[in-house]
């Protein structure tokens, strides 16, 4: 049986859902060993790709990890650049689920050791860049920063602009995750500087735009953030990366909601963008936009509850919705409290549909922040509201007169002293 026929039979077995037979046939192709025949090498590459896809489809992550290890002898069939691409592709095949990350990190570390042994510097650097990304996804930020520092010093000596761009971008994302915003900005600037010196692939440019938008949103500059998110969305859409395009679209909607641009939000929700990515994620943002427009805490909380997986899973969305909820709660409390000089906290809670504990906590914070003036009487369970104290201008005027008189007296003393001399 020739390698070609084995590959064809394996593909047919996949189509007929005979999984075990397909796996055996793909392995038969791979077990032919190292060959200088280009045709055989191409068939082995195809078998490797198809078998890895099959393992992914069947959620057989351990088998995929073994395949990565067992395929190393075949790398002699390919150029160093091609073998590096194959190894990275195989690691990327793992599911993006959180539970598969430890195995993926283990496989990446194992491949790095192999690359060091084989003295494949370019492959090792590419794998270390991938490992940083995995550490970031796994929230192993200390490990990520340690590896970033080591890799950056090496890449700067080699002046590899492309990898420098990728690593600086990852550095920005890691620092943003640990809320070191100044370093996140500095890293992003470094990434853009490196990117300007070389051709920047659309995917990398999209990721740079996305990170730029996220940092501008953190500065509450949602107008600029929207522009970057739109650029990222256009880039990811052209690459058919639906997952990242959808995230960018959600951030675009979030920016317009935070800007209180009702017409822009409605335009986005009814336009071609929302139609293409219609689903629960877009409906979640629609519900948030509607609740914000109506200034309704009840609708806002209902949206957060009904679309919890879509809204809570994204830390960027979650962070800004928390800020939006706080602002909405403050506005509702101010509107309710305004007519009263003394009111029971339980009555306020009943009017806005929240628990007494929640309302009391928020009122305390607002008083401390001087959003309004008052005290909480714990004994009676009441909020006592005061008028904003007016500063008496007399004291300021008196202090100014005393200051001027002091200046005049000092000058008189100086003049008298000069005359005596």
UniProtKB/Swiss-Prot annotation:
Record's keyword terms, sorted: Proteasome
Signal peptide region: none
Superkingdom field: Eukaryota
Transmembrane segments: none
Domain called PCI: residue spans: 221-390
Listed GO CC annotations: cytosol; nucleus; proteasome regulatory particle, lid subcomplex
GO molecular function, one term: structural molecule activity
A Pfam family of this chain: PCI
InterPro entries: 26S_Proteasome/COP9_Components, PCI_dom, Rpn6_C_helix, Rpn6_N, WH_DNA-bd_sf
Regions annotated as coiled coil: none
GO biological process, one term: ubiquitin-dependent protein catabolic process
SUPFAM superfamilies membership: Winged helix' DNA-binding domain
Function comment: Component of the lid subcomplex of the 26S proteasome, a multiprotein complex involved in the ATP-dependent degradation of ubiquitinated proteins. In the complex, rpn6 is required for proteasome assembly.
Similarity annotation: Belongs to the proteasome subunit S9 family.
Subunit annotation: Component of the lid subcomplex of the 19S proteasome regulatory particle complex (also named PA700 complex). The 26S proteasome consists of a 20S proteasome core and two 19S regulatory subunits.
Stated name of the protein: Probable 26S proteasome regulatory subunit rpn6
Organism for this UniProt entry: Schizosaccharomyces pombe (strain 972 / ATCC 24843) (Fission yeast)
């Amino acid at each position: 049986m020739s390698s070609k026929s084995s590959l064809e039979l394996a593909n047919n077995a996949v189509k007929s859902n005979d999984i075990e037979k397909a796996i055996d046939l793909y392995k038969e192709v791979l077990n032919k060993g190292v060959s200088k025949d280009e045709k055989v090498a191409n068939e082995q590459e195809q078998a490797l790709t198809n078998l890895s896809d099959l393992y992914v489809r069947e959620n057989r992550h351990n088998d995929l990890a073994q395949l990565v290890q067992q395929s190393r002898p075949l790398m002699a069939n390919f150029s160093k650049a091609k073998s590096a691409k194959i190894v990275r592709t195989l690691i990327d095949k793992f599911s993006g689920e959180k539970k598969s990350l430890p195995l993926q990190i283990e496989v990446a570390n194992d491949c790095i050791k192999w690359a060091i042994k084989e003295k494949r510097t370019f492959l090792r650097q590419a794998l270390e860049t991938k490992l940083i990304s995995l550490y970031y996804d796994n929230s192993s930020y200390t490990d990520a920063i340690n590896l970033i520092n080591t890799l950056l010093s090496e890449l700067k000596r080699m002046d590899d602009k492309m990898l420098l761009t990728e690593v600086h971008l990852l550095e920005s994302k890691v620092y943003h995750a640990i809320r070191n915003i100044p370093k996140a900005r500095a890293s992003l600037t470094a990434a853009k500087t490196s990117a300007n010196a070389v051709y920047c692939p659309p995917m990398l440019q999209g990721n740079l735009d996305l990170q730029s938008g996220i940092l501008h949103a953190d500065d509450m500059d949602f107008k600029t953030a929207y522009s970057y998110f739109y650029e990222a969305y256009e880039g990811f859409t052209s690459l058919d990366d639906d997952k990242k395009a959808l995230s960018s679209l959600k951030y675009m909607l979030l920016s317009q909601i935070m800007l209180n641009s009702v017409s822009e939000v409605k335009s986005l929700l009814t336009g071609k963008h929302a139609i293409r990515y219609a689903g629960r994620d877009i409906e979640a943002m629609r519900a948030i936009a509607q609740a914000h427009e109506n200034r309704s805490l009840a609708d806002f909380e209902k949206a957060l509850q009904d679309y919890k997986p879509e809204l809570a899973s994204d830390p960027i969305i979650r962070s800004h919705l928390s800020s939006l909820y706080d602002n909405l709660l403050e506005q509702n409390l101010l509107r309710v409290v305004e007519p009263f000089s003394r009111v029971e906290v339980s009555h306020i809670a009943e009017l806005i549909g929240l628990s007494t504990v929640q309302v009391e906590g928020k009122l305390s914070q607002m008083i401390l922040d001087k959003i309004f003036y008052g005290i909480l009487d714990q004994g009676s369970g009441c909020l006592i509201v005061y008028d904003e104290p007016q500063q008496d201008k007399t004291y300021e005027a008196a202090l100014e007169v005393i200051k001027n008189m002091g200046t005049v007296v000092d000058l008189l003393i100086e003049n008298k002293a000069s005359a005596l001399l």
